[in-house]
């Protein structure tokens, strides 16, 4: 692919292995934006964990203070009644039990998040082969199995992100869009890192947040100097 002079200059400006202060890193990301769409801002966090060990797996969710900039479609499995009404009032795009399961089995899977109350999991369990591979299976560790579906829907619609360390011990997550204010992106990143620190496995030894890098959808990765972040 032929690079423009501008893109070459941007790539040269990012020194491999150098950690940049968060403010400078965000400016580099915004300068590097080249797509005709509004790019997402992604973070990759290498953790000091051995995910092969069951007591060092990291999985959770964070409500980003500035949201994600994405419209989120939410389906909720909940028996009819007050909780179902709460979910609808909170903005759920679909609510049901067996009827909702039948629609999903027929191919209606255009959802970003699936939430369920504990008593609805008997229905959701039958959809494991459909929801599991898509990362949609409700799980209490990320707040998608909840006694309060209304609150869970509000969180999902307000910018809650879910994450899980991959086989290499890396968390990948979207923390906003390149058109966000610099401060909003910084606050979102700090909120995510603070929550990750809170769920650090006790068996994890040594440096936990080993490497934090930001990138836009089409831009270069920029390693962050963690001392420029507020993580308390």
From Swiss-Prot:
One of its GO terms (cellular component) is cytosolic large ribosomal subunit. PROSITE patterns: RIBOSOMAL_L1. GO terms for biological process: regulation of translation; translation. Keywords: Repressor, Ribonucleoprotein, Ribosomal protein, RNA-binding, rRNA-binding, Translation regulation, tRNA-binding. One of its GO terms (molecular function) is tRNA binding. The keyword Metal-binding does not apply. It comes from the Bacteria. The keyword Mitochondrion does not apply. It holds the Pfam family Ribosomal_L1. Binds directly to 23S rRNA. The L1 stalk is quite mobile in the ribosome, and is involved in E site tRNA release. Protein L1 is also a translational repressor protein, it controls the translation of the L11 operon by binding to its mRNA. Part of the 50S ribosomal subunit. Belongs to the universal ribosomal protein uL1 family. NCBIfam families: rplA_bact. This is Large ribosomal subunit protein uL1. It comes from Xylella fastidiosa (strain 9a5c).
């Amino acid at each position: 692919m032929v690079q423009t002079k501008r893109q070459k200059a941007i790539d040269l400006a990012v020194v491999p292995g150098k950690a940049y202060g968060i403010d400078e890193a965000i400016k580099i990301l915004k300068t590097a934006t080249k797509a005709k769409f509004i790019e997402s801002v992604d973070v990759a966090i290498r953790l000091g964990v051995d995910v092969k060990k069951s007591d060092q797996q990291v999985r959770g969710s964070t409500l980003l203070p500035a949201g994600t900039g994405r419209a989120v479609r939410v389906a909720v499995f909940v028996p009819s009644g007050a909780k179902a009404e709460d979910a609808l009032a909170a903005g759920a795009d679909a609510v049901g039990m067996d009827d909702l399961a039948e629609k999903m089995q027929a191919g209606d899977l255009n959802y970003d998040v699936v939430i369920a109350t504990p008593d609805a999991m008997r229905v959701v369990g039958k959809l494991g082969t459909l929801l599991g591979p898509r990362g949609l299976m409700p799980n209490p560790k990320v707040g998608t199995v909840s006694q309060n579906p209304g609150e869970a829907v509000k969180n999902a619609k307000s910018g809650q992100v879910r994450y899980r360390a991959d086989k290499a011990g890396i968390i990948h997550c979207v923390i906003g869009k390149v058109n966000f204010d610099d401060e909003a992106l910084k606050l979102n990143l700090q909120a995510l890192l603070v929550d990750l620190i809170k769920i650090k496995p006790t068996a994890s030894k040594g440096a936990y947040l080993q490497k934090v890098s930001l990138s836009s959808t089409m831009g270069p990765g920029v390693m962050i100097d963690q001392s420029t972040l507020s993580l308390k």
